[in-house]
Amino acid sequence: MKSNWKKYNGSLIAKFPPHKIIKENKIEINQKIKESDVLFARWITDFDSKSKTSFWYVINDKHMELSDYSSNTRNQIKKGLLNFSIKLVPSSVILKNGYNIYQNVFREYNSILKIKSEAKYLESLKGNYEFWGVFYKNKLVGYSQNKIKHNACDYSTIKISRKYNHKYASYALFFTMNSFYLKDKKLKYVSDGARSILHKSNIQDFLI
C-alpha cells in the first residue's frame, strides 16, 4: 500500500496538501513514526482557521494582476521580468544543472542541516514534479520544483542565489508561477509550505 507520508528533516510529513484531512488516527501515526525511525510526525488540522496560531502555511488563493500590487512591488516585478526569463523546463535541465545551484544556495543559508550528496539530491528530484527555470543571460541560475496534487500546487523547493536579490529574481518567479497556476490552470491555491524555522527567508512575504 502506498504511504501518505514521507520523511523530511528527521520527521514525517503528509504527502498531500494541507487542506486534505489526515485519515489515520494517532495510534496509526505513532506506529508509522516507529517504523520510519523519525522523531515526530507533522500534519495539519483545522486548515484555514480564523484564529491565529504559532504555526501556519503560506498560501495564495487569489490571482493578482500586475496592477493589483503596490507601486513599489509592481516596479520590482517589472525589473525582475526584464532581468530574467522564467519558464517551465523538463526535469533533465534540473538533473543536469541543479546540483551546483543547490550547493551554492545551501551555503548561503544559516542552516542546521547538512548538504545532500549529489546522489541524494538527484533522488529528491524524482516523482511527479513540474520544474520552472530562472534564466539570467540565458544561463540557469535558479529553479522551482513544484508538486500539483488535489487541485493545489506546492512550491516544494525553490533555489535562487541571494546575489540575484537586487535584480528581483524571486519576484519574477513568483509572479509568473502564480499567474500560471491560479489564472491559467485555475487551481485552488498555491503554497510555499509551512512557516520556515530552519533558515531565514523573505520569499514567503510575497505570497501572503
Q: Where do the PLM segments sit?
A:
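Conserved acetyl-CoA-binding loop-helix of GNAT-fold acetyltransferases
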Residues: 166-180
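A conserved beta-strand-loop-helix scaffold within acyl/acetyltransferase catalytic domains
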Residues: 1-10, 41-50, 59-166, 181
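Conserved active-site alpha-helix within GNAT-family acetyltransferase domains
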Residues: 50-53, 197-208
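Short amphipathic alpha-helical segments and helix-helix/interface helices
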Residues: 27-33, 74-77, 118-123, 178, ...
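Acidic-and-aromatic substrate-binding clefts and catalytic sites of carbohydrate-active enzymes
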Residues: 21-22, 94, 194-200
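N-terminal accessory interaction module
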Residues: 1-46
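Conserved GNAT acetyl-CoA-binding A-motif
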Residues: 37-44, 182-195
